[in-house]
């Protein structure tokens, strides 16, 4: 009987600086913001602006934010990603599947390049790439695909691989989100679904990210039985001067109390791991924003992180590719 092939699994995410210092953050941001999937401006205009103004200013400011949330295990994103890796490895081991799970960051470390090398060194015969972005966007999932392809470009013997494009309406994902909300949402709280934004221009060029976000939101709303006046979908973390997907999370929270929304719970379904954008921007900055503009109470519902239902969902996505 032929022995089943050893499967390599890449848990892919955006990435994180190596340390909470301006120098390390500048190096990370350079890698991130020079990816044309993220910023598609002409290099001759963008690179000088990035080097002379954006990186020096943003690196110092962001360093303070990272320092406030940094842990002994590194950034929250990296620390939780390691826990996810271990939990998924244990889940797959319990299914008697011969696998090796690696973390693969698009930017920073552990890099996609190093993760792929680890798999090849251990002679896996097939690779499954799981970008931890439930909703597809060219600037996230697309960037993972580019990084994966780049990591394999020198390989003469290209291994069979599967690339999980999205899972925005996967039943296990929707159930995990709904269950996470159920145990935390109070009966008198308004529920805000906040997704990371992208430039509106990208949508006009064919990126269907907003539609995926909408489908996720509607599926969860239906699961929870919410009425139209109990929830809203917004977009956060805009960067630069051009128009991004709207409504903007921060602007909505500024005006929420005036719309008679006094108590609010915010969830970020597009984030599989809590990170700077959820911990600092949503749980701190926007909490203050809401409360300072007449709001009474504010709750951030954490990312699914290493909840059992989340790990099981990942495992089932992998198993589906093996059947």
Curated annotation (Swiss-Prot):
Pfam family, one: Ferrochelatase
Keywords noted in UniProt: Cytoplasm, Heme biosynthesis, Iron, Lyase, Metal-binding, Porphyrin biosynthesis
Subcellular location: Cytoplasm
Source species, domain of life: Bacteria
Gene Ontology molecular functions: ferrochelatase activity; metal ion binding
InterPro entries, A to Z: Ferrochelatase, Ferrochelatase_AS, Ferrochelatase_C, Ferrochelatase_N
EC number(s) given by UniProt: 4.98.1.1
UniProt pathway: Porphyrin-containing compound metabolism; protoheme biosynthesis; protoheme from protoporphyrin-IX: step 1/1
Protein family according to the UniProt entry: Belongs to the ferrochelatase family.
Protein name: Ferrochelatase
Species in which this protein is naturally found: Haemophilus influenzae (strain ATCC 51907 / DSM 11121 / KW20 / Rd)
Lineage: Bacteria, Pseudomonadati, Pseudomonadota, Gammaproteobacteria, Pasteurellales
């Amino acid at each position: 009987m032929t022995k089943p092939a050893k499967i390599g699994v890449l848990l892919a995410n955006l990435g994180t600086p190596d340390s909470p210092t301006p120098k390390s953050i500048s190096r990370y941001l350079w890698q991130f913001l020079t990816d044309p999937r993220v910023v598609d401006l002409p290099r001759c205009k963008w690179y000088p602006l990035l080097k002379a103004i954006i990186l020096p200013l943003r690196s110092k400011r962001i360093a303070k934010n990272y320092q406030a949330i940094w842990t002994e295990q590194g950034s929250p994103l990296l620390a939780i990603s390691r826990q996810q890796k271990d939990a998924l490895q244990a889940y797959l081991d319990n299914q008697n599947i011969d696998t090796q799970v690696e973390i693969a960051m698009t930017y920073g470390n552990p890099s996609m390049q190093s993760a792929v090398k680890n798999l090849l060194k251990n002679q896996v015969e097939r690779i499954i790439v799981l970008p931890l972005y439930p909703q597809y966007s060219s600037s996230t999932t697309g960037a993972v695909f580019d990084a994966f392809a780049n990591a394999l470009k020198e390989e003469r013997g290209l291994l069979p691989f599967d690339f999980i494009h999205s899972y925005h309406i996967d039943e296990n994902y929707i159930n995990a989100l709904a269950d996470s909300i159920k145990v935390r949402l109070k009966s008198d709280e308004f529920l805000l679904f906040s997704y990371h934004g992208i430039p509106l221009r990208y949508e006009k060029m064919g990126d269907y990210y907003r539609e995926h976000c909408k489908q996720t939101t509607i599926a969860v709303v239906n699961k929870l039985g919410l009425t139209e006046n109990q929830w809203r979908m917004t977009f956060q973390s805009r960067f630069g001067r051009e128009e991004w997907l709207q409504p903007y999370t921060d602007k909505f929270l500024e005006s929420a109390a005036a719309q008679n929304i006094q108590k609010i719970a915010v969830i970020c379904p597009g984030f599989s791991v809590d990170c700077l954008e959820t911990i600092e921007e949503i749980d701190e900055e926007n909490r203050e924003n809401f409360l300072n503009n007449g709001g009474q109470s504010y709750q951030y519902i954490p990312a699914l992180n290493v909840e059992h239902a989340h790990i099981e969902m990942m495992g089932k996505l992998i198993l589906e590719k093996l059947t």
